[in-house]
Regions:
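Alpha-helical transmembrane segments of multi-pass membrane proteins
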Residues: 1-205
């Protein structure tokens, strides 16, 4: 019985790590593709990339804070599944937002800085917040299964950083070139749905 419990805990820890790694990778996939998506409307400049990096980091920070509070209030695996699924939905929705907002901003008299910020904020702030929730939420769940606090926190943050690195290089060097920007965003959303599913089915318990 104890062996079975240990095996389940080990599988849960592995899956939490996979989810943190992949969600962090997806966030950077969205960040890199954001530059490509808004380039036809505001170009590629210091202003556009400042907006992209700033907005996504702001969303990530807010998500980390919310995720920590949610975890302290008892957020469990179902909460993680909900967040991942919503992140997938809002990632798809970002493409629809661009379709509607582009004509409005193009016909406005907004300067480049304001337009860049509005594009990125309306498209990617919410997905960034949702993805930011994942790491503190799952790290807290992992700490309930392994008392080695430093080991678990360090591992999860390392996986998040590694996922971000892989997501950055994979998108910039390979994914966009071979699949196109919109398909990459759709693929990222699909990946989030796949990550969310086991949490609803409670496979990692």
């Amino acid at each position: 019985m104890n062996q079975s419990t240990d095996d389940k805990s080990r599988l849960s820890l592995i899956w939490y790590g996979v989810a943190i790694f992949m969600s962090s990778a997806v966030l950077l996939v969205l960040e890199i593709t954001a530059g490509r998506l808004i380039a036809p409307y505001v170009g590629v400049s210091l202003y556009s990339w400042t907006s992209i990096i700033g907005v996504i980091l702001a969303g990530l920070s807010l998500g980390n804070w919310l995720g920590g509070r949610w975890a302290d209030k008892g957020g469990g695996e179902t909460a993680a599944g909900i967040v991942l699924a919503l992140a997938g939905l809002t990632s798809i929705f970002s493409l629809l937002v661009l379709t509607f907002i582009a004509p409005v901003l193009q016909s406005s008299m907004l300067d480049l800085i304001s337009a860049s910020f509005i594009y990125v904020f309306t498209m990617f702030f919410v997905p960034s917040v949702l993805l930011g929730v994942v790491t503190p939420l799952l790290t807290t769940l992992a700490l309930k299964l392994d008392v080695r606090t430093g080991h678990i926190v360090g591992r999860m943050h390392a996986l998040a950083a590694l996922g971000s690195i892989i997501g950055t290089f994979a998108t910039g060097y390979w994914l966009v070139q071979y699949f196109g920007t919109r398909n990459v965003v759709l693929g990222a959303a699909f990946c989030l749905f796949v990550l969310a599913a086991p949490f609803f089915r409670r496979v990692p318990t």
